[in-house]
Amino acid sequence: MRISMMAETSPLERRVPAERPLSPHLQIYRPMLTMMMSIVHRLTGFANYFGTLLLAWWLIAAASPNGYAKFQWFASSWIGRLILFGYTWSVIHHMLGGIRHLIWDTGRGFGPKEREWLVAANLVGSIAITVVLWIFIILTTGVG
């Protein structure tokens, strides 16, 4: 009986890589509106968590005149209004995106034209509703 001094190769070491295509990488995709709006939908969902802190601050500030005065000072500053405007758009955009996803859950709107129309309607609708809402707020409250 002869003992070989050479180490045997394991089945993993003898394995030959399979000849199959690799998944395409994100860098080869041309950005599409649906892809961008999917990312924006996730970002607005994330931003809504932080915007809800503003809502909590407003509710907590209502407990004292001094606290409410501080919130009013922030909300009436240009940066406060910009943040509130952005939060308004974020909530509306995320809501319309949720409606778009509900439509997709029914199995409708997956054709190329329908998909692009829904995404464009989501974007245009969220901007239009936000602007109309803020015009209404400015006209009815005299904030300007």
Which residues does each predicted region cover?
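Membrane-embedded alpha-helical bundles that constitute the cytochrome b-like, heme-associated redox core
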Residues: 1-144
